[in-house]
């Protein structure tokens, strides 16, 4: 306790007084007994006794942690690939795709770097850098590789859901939103007439619709993956036997069957995307040769 503008320590108890002084002010030092309880989290300077009888002690705490916590709120910079940990795209970004690249001359926007670069060729020879300029940089689209949360309320991938978890990247989020929250314009042209939101899902379903996958033990399955799991689980005496001419029951599959079907259809979506990228790389070289020969690019494509 303090007595007559002097301080003393009673036993092992520490006395701490919050400072009201301005930051950076230098206080004269006083003789102070060493506390028997060292502080690992904070430091306290010597208390100052002024002529008015008021004792002031400056409290100096450690700096805050260097790790920045992203709340995903109003901090827009928290959504960049350099600082952010996840991304919550808006509904328009999910349906249309985020615009990543802009022409520096006319401000026309593109969602692919190579399309923007080829568009700029039409603005003059100073922008013509050859086919290699179409490849762009990896950092320009790094935000598309961030884990994404769904913006739909009530979705298990929404950040406010009690058991929420992010999706792998932006493309996975787009497919998820179409499947779970979007319209289903694709209808099976066979007897079941089941509807789908993703074209790849629809194609895969029609390819296998009406088929049963049989095991030699007599069990039948609607999905080839289920048959493989059955054979792997029971081992000897079980093997695949396919019958493709038999029509199975009509109606919606149960939830487990739908999840198995979606896992198979993810592979189809990735194959379609890879084929599209390969065709695009070939077309870029053809378009560049066409531009060098005729000096123009169709505005319909760009």
From Swiss-Prot:
SUPFAM superfamilies assigned: beta-beta-alpha zinc fingers (SSF57667)
Deletion phenotype: Defects in venation pattern in leaves and cotyledons, altered phyllotaxy of vegetative leaves, short roots, delay in leaf initiation and reduced apical dominance.
Polar residues bias locations: 26-38
Main location: nucleus
Disulfide bonds: none
GO cellular component terms listed in the entry, alphabetical order: nucleus
A Pfam match: zf-C2H2_STOP2_3rd
Keywords linked to the UniProt accession: Metal-binding, Nucleus, Repeat, Transcription, Transcription regulation, Zinc, Zinc-finger
Span of zinc fingers (C2H2-type): 101-123, 149-181, 186-209, 213-238
Biological process, per Gene Ontology: cotyledon vascular tissue pattern formation; leaf vascular tissue pattern formation; phloem or xylem histogenesis; root development; shoot system development
Composition bias type Acidic residues, residue spans: 252-274
Keyword Metal-binding: yes
Subcellular location: Nucleus
Stretch list, region Disordered: 1-78, 245-281
Similarity comment: family membership: Belongs to the WIP C2H2-type zinc-finger protein family.
Matches recorded under PANTHER family: ZINC FINGER PROTEIN WIP2 (PTHR45878), ZINC FINGER PROTEIN WIP6 (PTHR45878:SF45)
Job of this protein: Probable transcriptional regulator. Involved in leaf vasculature patterning.
Annotated protein name in UniProt: Zinc finger protein WIP6
Organism of derivation: Arabidopsis thaliana (Mouse-ear cress)
Name of encoding gene: WIP6
């Amino acid at each position: 306790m303090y007595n007559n503008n002097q301080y003393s320590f009673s036993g092992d108890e520490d006395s701490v007084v919050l400072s009201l002084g301005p930051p950076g002010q230098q206080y004269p030092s006083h003789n102070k007994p060493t506390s028997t309880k060292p502080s690992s989290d904070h430091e306290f300077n010597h208390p100052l006794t002024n002529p008015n009888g008021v004792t002031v002690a400056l409290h100096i705490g450690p700096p805050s942690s260097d790790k920045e916590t992203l709340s995903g709120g109003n901090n827009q910079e928290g959504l960049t690939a350099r600082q952010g940990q996840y991304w919550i795209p808006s509904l328009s970004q999910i349906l249309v795709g985020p615009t990543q690249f802009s022409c520096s001359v006319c401000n026309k926007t593109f969602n692919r770097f190579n399309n923007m670069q080829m568009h700029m060729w039409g603005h003059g020879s100073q922008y013509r850098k050859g086919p290699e300029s179409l490849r762009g940089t990896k950092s320009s689209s790094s935000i598309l590789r961030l884990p994404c949360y769904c913006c739909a309320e009530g979705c298990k991938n929404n950040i406010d859901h009690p058991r929420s978890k992010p999706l792998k990247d932006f493309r996975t989020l787009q497919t998820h939103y179409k499947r779970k929250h979007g319209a289903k314009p694709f209808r099976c042209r066979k007897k079941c007439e089941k509807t789908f939101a993703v074209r790849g899902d629809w194609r895969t379903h029609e390819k296998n619709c009406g088929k049963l996958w049989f095991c030699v033990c007599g069990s039948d399955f609607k999905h080839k993956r289920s048959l493989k799991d059955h054979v792997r689980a029971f081992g000897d005496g079980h093997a695949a036997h396919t019958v493709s001419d038999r029509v199975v029951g009509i109606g919606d599959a149960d939830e487990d069957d739908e999840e198995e079907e979606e896992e198979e259809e993810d592979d189809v979506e990735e194959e379609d995307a890879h084929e599209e990228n390969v065709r695009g790389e070939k077309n870029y070289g053809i378009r560049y040769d066409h531009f060098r020969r005729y000096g123009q690019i169709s505005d319909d494509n760009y």
